[in-house]
Amino acid sequence: MLKTLRSAIFAGIYIGTAGFGFLASGIQSETYGSLVGAVLFSLGLMAVVGYKLKLYTGTAGFINKNEIGQLFLILLGNIIGCLCLGLMTRVSPMDIQAAAQKVLELRLKTGALRCGLLGIPCGLLMTTAVTFARKGNMLPLLLAVPLFIVCGFT
């Protein structure tokens, strides 16, 4: 249990770092900024897959029925890891607040139901990409992330 939590925390840190890179890359500069950010975000996911860390979105598509209870622990660890990274960004000289605010406002404007529905193709893309990555082919992971971000499936 502790090993799973530790793995999930590190996955959260990697994804938090990827998110920071996404915001810092200039998402506010429309398509090209978000495309660059999406490619940078892929590196965080590649690290999670490469190090075999526990990320909720990468686990949910592969988990057995008898392991469903682990999903809560993984989600908790991911949140802790992201929060740790979020606290570290507070001392960064980069001002990403405006970009983060823009993303948050877009999610709130979209609404929970629509965001949830848009998450379905995101999950399908990521499950497919992770399946390939676990077999040693990282290219689909590199391409799936920009695809779901550019399509707005986040």
Cite the ranges covered by each PLM segment.
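Alpha-helical transmembrane segments and their helix-helix packing motifs
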Residues: 1-154
